[in-house]
C-alpha cells in the first residue's frame, strides 16, 4: 500500500494514494481533520488523523473505543466510516463522509428558522433513538458535533467520549453548556438521559440563537439551570453523593421554575412543550428519544417504519479491561483488518494486494512493550 506524506498545520499527514487534494479542515486535541477526494468512489471525504493514538494505555483504549463504535454503529443520522488505515508512522486515520458545515457554524452565521430547527431536531432524535437502542450514551452532544450538508441532512459525529451505562461514571464529560445536571450533581451514575438533556439545550439554542445555559464555570452553570427550571426536587437532591456538592445545592436561594413559554414566547408552542419534557431535573421523567419522535413538534417527519433501532447491543466487554497500550494497539490493528475484510467482500473497492498489505503491516509489527 503506497503512502504520500505531507506536512499540514505543522503535523505530518500520511494518506494512501487513493486520496487526493488533501486540505486542512480543523485541528483539535485528539486529531487533525482534512478534506480529500476519494479517487475510487469519486466522493469528497473527511480524513481524521488520530493524534498519538498509542501515547498511553488510556488514550489507546479511547482510540479503540472510537474505532469500534464507528465500525459498528451504522445509521443515516450518524457519521459513516468509509475507510480506516494505519500509516507507516503508525498513526490511525479514519475516513468518513464529508459534510459541508456543522450546526455550531450555522448558528453563528444567522438565526435559524423554526422549520429548520424542527427538521434538524427530528434527525438528531432519530439518530439518538438508534444509538440508545445499541446501549450507547454519546455523552458529548453539542452543535459542533452535529454535521450538516447542503441538503440539510444531519449526522451525529465524534464518539470519542461515548460509553455504556455503568454504576459509576466520570463527571467531566460534555461541553459545559450542554451538560446534564445529574453529571454535575453526582458525577457517578447516569444514563442515556444525559443525551436528552443535551439535545434539549441544542433545541433551545436553535430557537433562541444563543446558548440556553452559558455557564462561566461549574457552579454558575448549575445556578443558570436552577434560575430557569427551579431548584432540584428532593428525590434528586437525595441522590447526591458528594458532601461538597450537596452543600452547594443546599446553599442556593429558592427558585421557582419559570414557564419556558415566557422565554420562547415567539416560538412554536409545540417546540416549547417538547423542551419542557426534555429539560427536567429528574432524569427518569425525561422524554426518551423514541418518545420524542412521536411528539407533535416532530410529527411532520415522524415515520415509525423508517426510524430503525440497532440489531443488537454494542459489545462493551472490553470496557473494564486494564491492558497495556501494546495490547490495545494489537486490538485496533485487528479491527482495521476486520473492517477491510468486510469492505473487500461487500464493495470490491479493496484489492487483494491492498488487503495483503494491511495484513503484512500487522504481521511485521511487534507488540511487546518497549
Curated annotation (Swiss-Prot):
The active site is at residue 140. The modification Phosphothreonine is found at residue 170. Dually phosphorylated on Thr-170 and Tyr-172, which activates the enzyme. It catalyses: L-seryl-[protein] + ATP = O-phospho-L-seryl-[protein] + ADP + H(+); L-threonyl-[protein] + ATP = O-phospho-L-threonyl-[protein] + ADP + H(+). Residues 19-298 form the Protein kinase domain. SUPFAM superfamilies: Protein kinase-like (PK-like). Disulfide bonds: none annotated. A motif (TXY) lies at residues 170-172. Gene3D superfamilies: Phosphorylase Kinase, domain 1, Transferase(Phosphotransferase) domain 1. Keywords: ATP-binding, Kinase, Nucleotide-binding, Phosphoprotein, Serine/threonine-protein kinase, Transferase. Pfam families: Pkinase. It is an enzyme of class 2 (transferase). Its cofactor is Mg(2+). ATP binds at residues 25-33, 48. Activated by tyrosine and threonine phosphorylation. One of its GO terms (molecular function) is ATP binding. It comes from the Eukaryota. Its EC number is 2.7.11.24. The modification Phosphotyrosine is found at residue 172. The TXY motif contains the threonine and tyrosine residues whose phosphorylation activates the MAP kinases. Belongs to the protein kinase superfamily. Ser/Thr protein kinase family. MAP kinase subfamily. HOG1 sub-subfamily. Mitogen-activated protein kinase required for growth on media where sorbitol or mannitol is the sole carbon source. This is Mitogen-activated protein kinase mpkC. It comes from Aspergillus terreus (strain NIH 2624 / FGSC A1156).
Amino acid at each position: 500500500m503506497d503512502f504520500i506524506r505531507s506536512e499540514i498545520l505543522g503535523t505530518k499527514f500520511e494518506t494512501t494514494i487513493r486520496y487526493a487534494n488533501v486540505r486542512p479542515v480543523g485541528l483539535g486535541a485528539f486529531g487533525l481533520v482534512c478534506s480529500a477526494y476519494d479517487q475510487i468512489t469519486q466522493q469528497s471525504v473527511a480524513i481524521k488523523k488520530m493524534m498519538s493514538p498509542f501515547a498511553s494505555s488510556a488514550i489507546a483504549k479511547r482510540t479503540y473505543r472510537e474505532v469500534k463504535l464507528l465500525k459498528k454503529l451504522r445509521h443515516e443520522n450518524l457519521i459513516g466510516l468509509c475507510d480506516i488505515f494505519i500509516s507507516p508512522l503508525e498513526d490511525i486515520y479514519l475516513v468518513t463522509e464529508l459534510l459541508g458545515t456543522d450546526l455550531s457554524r450555522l448558528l453563528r452565521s444567522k438565526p435559524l428558522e423554526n422549520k429548520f430547527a424542527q427538521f434538524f431536531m427530528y434527525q438528531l432524535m432519530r439518530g439518538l433513538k438508534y444509538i440508545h437502542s445499541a446501549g450507547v450514551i454519546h455523552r458529548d452532544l453539542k452543535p459542533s458535533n452535529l454535521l450538516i450538508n447542503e441538503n440539510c441532512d444531519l449526522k451525529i459525529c465524534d464518539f470519542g467520549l461515548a460509553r455504556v451505562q455503568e454504576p459509576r461514571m466520570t463527571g467531566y464529560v460534555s461541553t459545559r453548556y450542554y451538560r446534564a445536571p445529574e453529571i454535575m450533581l453526582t458525577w457517578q451514575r447516569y444514563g442515556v438521559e444525559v443525551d436528552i438533556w443535551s439535545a434539549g439545550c441544542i433545541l433551545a439554542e436553535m430557537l433562541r440563537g444563543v446558548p440556553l445555559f452559558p455557564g462561566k464555570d461549574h457552579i454558575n452553570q448549575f445556578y443558570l439551570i436552577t434560575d430557569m427550571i427551579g431548584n432540584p426536587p428532593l428525590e434528586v437532591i437525595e441522590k447526591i453523593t458528594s458532601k461538597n456538592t450537596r452543600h452547594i445545592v443546599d446553599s442556593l436561594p429558592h427558585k421557582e421554575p419559570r414557564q419556558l413559554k415566557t422565554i420562547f414566547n415567539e416560538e412554536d408552542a409545540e417546540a416549547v412543550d417538547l423542551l419542557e419534557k426534555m429539560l427536567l431535573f429528574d432524569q427518569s421523567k425525561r422524554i426518551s428519544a423514541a418518545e420524542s419522535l412521536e411528539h407533535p413538534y416532530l410529527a411532520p417527519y415522524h415515520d415509525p417504519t423508517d426510524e430503525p433501532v440497532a440489531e443488537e447491543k454494542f459489545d462493551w466487554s472490553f470496557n473494564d479491561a486494564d491492558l497495556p497500550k501494546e495490547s490495545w494497539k494489537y486490538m485496533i490493528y485487528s479491527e482495521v483488518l476486520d473492517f477491510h475484510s468486510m469492505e473487500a467482500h461487500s464493495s470490491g473497492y479493496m484489492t487483494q494486494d491492498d488487503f495483503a498489505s494491511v495484513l503484512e503491516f500487522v504481521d511485521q509489527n511487534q507488540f511487546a512493550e518497549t
